[in-house]
From Swiss-Prot:
The reaction proceeds by a bi uni uni bi ping pong mechanism. The lineage of its organism: Bacteria, Pseudomonadati, Pseudomonadota, Alphaproteobacteria, Rhodobacterales. Keywords: ATP-binding, Cytoplasm, Ligase, Nucleotide-binding, Pantothenate biosynthesis. Transmembrane segments: none annotated. It is found in: Cytoplasm. Beta-alanine binds at residue 62. HAMAP family: PanC. Pathway: Cofactor biosynthesis; (R)-pantothenate biosynthesis; (R)-pantothenate from (R)-pantoate and beta-alanine: step 1/1. This is Pantothenate synthetase. It comes from Dinoroseobacter shibae (strain DSM 16493 / NCIMB 14021 / DFL 12).
Amino acid sequence: MTDVMRDVASLRMLQGMWRRAGETVGLVPTMGALHDGHMALARAAREECGKVIATIFVNPTQFGPTEDLDAYPNTFDSDLHMLREVGVDVVFAPTRDVMYPAGFGTTVKVAGLTAPLCGAARPGHFDGVTQVVAKLLNLGQADRAYFGQKDWQQLAVVRQMVRDLNFPTEIVGIPTVRAEDGLALSSRNAYLTEAEREIAPILYRTIRDAAARVAAGHGATGVCEAAARGLLGKGFTRIDYLECRDATTLAPAETPDPGTARIFVAAQLGGARLIDNVSVG
């Protein structure tokens, strides 16, 4: 039976019992509106750890003032059912007041990796991400924490934070889960109309083809610019970025060695901002 906890004291008490019993703890941070991508994280944690905590918290500090905080899907009952099916031990679902009580004033900022891509398109976003992840890692006291590779930049930022601040947690990246037509699973896919959902898989095909061209020796800048124009001609209304960057440093990569770079994209389609990335070579 999966327990639902909303306060820190209860979670701490349970963790103390687990630690005394020598359990390995896995943490799966989410904002809810779960799909098979989240379930891949939970299943990996279940397979590798004696105890698993999943968190459901829509973190307000990682949303900009014009973004979709108020519209973000709330599907708690179905989320809980899915997590129970996987065998998660505890769902930690705090309120905003629990996470950010009156007088809260601490931020965590990772320099460098947060500057390009989503960091440039969504100022302040990663400050909110590192703030909440630092809190969840502290509260979860996990041996391992699981993140999806669809949010590659987020994964890189969290790994940097964990290294820099000496968190005793291994950050585990899980490959992107896709629909049969290639679209990366995302909670924000729910914003797509039926017609937009037909268009959406073009995003993955476009960056996959761009990655193949860069791997074949074509210059990344020209390839990515052409790919972005192609998306705008097929129904996407804005391209925040479509770039080839080093997979580790996120520095621009014009003619990368095989396996060292990725093509990153963020594009608006109707009411949904879709992100994805693929390896070059």
